[in-house]
């Protein structure tokens, strides 16, 4: 495996460990053991742990924001259906990793800045979809805030519920926001 190992492999395992155990568990030696390589392999790709953590934030933003937006945009021509798909995708992919990045952001400026940029980008996307659905800009802005914070909150407060139940509730919230005058 070592001959095929690249920086992306380190970043991906770092994200898995982050989602499962938190940022403090993202350490070079345990990651190297998990990958079946020496620490030297790590330093071939990264100068230090901070560089790996920064790479993880970039990759997380791509996976959890850009890739999701691209998938949603391809899902339908109808803004309401794209919002439904976005809601489903949030619960299909986002939970543990997003929660871990938010926890990390509570004590790390780089992670906090990444969260702020991602939140702004996601909010703007939701607002645009609501405007395309026909809501006036000011109403769309307020409902985008409600919807986005609801989706983020659901990932933290309903952990004991089944994914299907959480998606059903989130879709109900979405439909309520779309139907209100």
Where would I find each of the regions flagged by the language model?
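Generic hydrophobic, amphipathic alpha-helix propensity
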Residues: 3-17, 31, 56-60, 64, ...
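Helix-turn-helix
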Residues: 9, 13-51, 55
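Solvent-exposed, amphipathic alpha-helical segments
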Residues: 13-21, 67-71, 101, 146, ...
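Residues in soluble alpha-helical coiled-coils and helical-bundle/repeat scaffolds
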Residues: 47-51, 73, 77, 92, ...
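Hydrophobic/aromatic residues within well-ordered alpha-helical segments
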Residues: 49, 56, 60-64, 75, ...
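Hydrophobic alpha-helical connector segments
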Residues: 55, 69-99, 147
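Amphipathic alpha-helical packing segments from all-alpha helical-bundle domains
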Residues: 65-66, 93-99, 109-134, 138, ...
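Amphipathic C-terminal alpha-helical segment
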Residues: 96, 100, 147-164, 176-181
């Amino acid at each position: 495996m070592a001959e095929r190992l690249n920086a992306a492999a380190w970043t991906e395992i770092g994200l898995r460990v982050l989602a499962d155990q938190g940022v403090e568990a993202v350490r070079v030696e345990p990651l190297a053991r998990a990958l079946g390589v020496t620490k030297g392999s790590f330093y071939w790709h990264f100068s230090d742990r901070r560089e790996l953590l920064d790479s993880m934030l970039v990759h997380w933003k791509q996976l959890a924001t850009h890739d999701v937006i691209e998938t949603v945009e391809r899902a339908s021509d109808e803004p309401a259906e794209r919002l439904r798909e976005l809601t489903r995708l949030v619960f299909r992919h986002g939970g543990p990793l997003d929660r871990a990045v938010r926890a990390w952001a509570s004590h790390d400026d780089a992670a906090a800045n990444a969260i702020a940029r991602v939140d702004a980008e996601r909010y703007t996307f939701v607002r645009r979809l609501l405007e395309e659905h026909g809501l006036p800009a000011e109403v769309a802005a307020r409902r985008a805030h409600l919807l986005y914070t609801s989706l983020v909150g659901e990932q933290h407060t309903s952990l004991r519920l089944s994914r299907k139940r959480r998606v059903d509730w989130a879709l109900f919230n979405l439909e309520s926001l779309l139907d209100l005058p």
